Amino acid sequence: MAIINNHSSINLDAGFQGDHSELLQFFFNQGLNIEITDDVSSLKTFLESLSDEEYPYNFDAAFNESFIDKEGFVLYLKNSDTIVSTYAAKGLDKGIFKEGMKEIYEGNYEVVDIGIDPACYSSCQWVAKSHRGKKFGMCLDHLKKNIIFDKTRFGINYAIHKESFKDYHINGLHYSNSEKFATIPNGDVGGAGEKIDKVYNIAWISKDEWLIKRNEVKSLYTS
């Protein structure tokens, strides 16, 4: 099993692989390869090709543009050539993100202080139904955080999620915080919720907080 480096500027090199050997070995032991790329258009094409049963969300509009000057990346877990899980992240200051979300989704927005920019927004997490319940989503999220904090300049990672996923983001994905961010009467926030989901939280973690947590979570990859 292998790391497939298809990104123009981020390389998951031997040093990175050594620092995160337990996490990477978790995937390799399941017969999965890990690909990193900056081709976000292929991610959109792939997610939009899935059935509503597999991926019941609209594509996140924050990832409609290329990653030029955004320091973004896409992660794929692959069983041979078959994609079984995805994730994406990009540099996006929280204020710009909020204003962009307001333009698309009418609603009531809260004032939440998540820390000092530069910040990295992540979304487009998906695991194939055939591979759910095996910790792949959690572990790919942890890999994403390691890449953000080891390989980019960002000091904050944040994400949007429906309110009912707060426990999962705190105790599963190991974000440090999750607070109410917006009430969207029509729901259906791309990458985060369906039409029935009206209340959304913002989850976040700083680099310093993650450096402490990631030693604590290593046991999750071997248990």
Task: Say what each PLM segment does.
Residues 34, 75-77, 83, 136, ...:
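Hydrophobic beta-strand residues in large extracellular and virion-surface proteins
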Residues 49-83, 88:
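Active-site rim helix/loop that mediates acceptor-substrate recognition in acyltransferases
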Residues 63, 106-112, 143-145:
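Short secondary-structure capping micro-motifs at structural edges
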Residues 83-124:
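Conserved acyl-donor/pantetheine-binding loop and adjacent beta-alpha core of acyl/acetyltransferases
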Residues 127, 132-147:
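Conserved acetyl-CoA-binding loop-helix of GNAT-fold acetyltransferases
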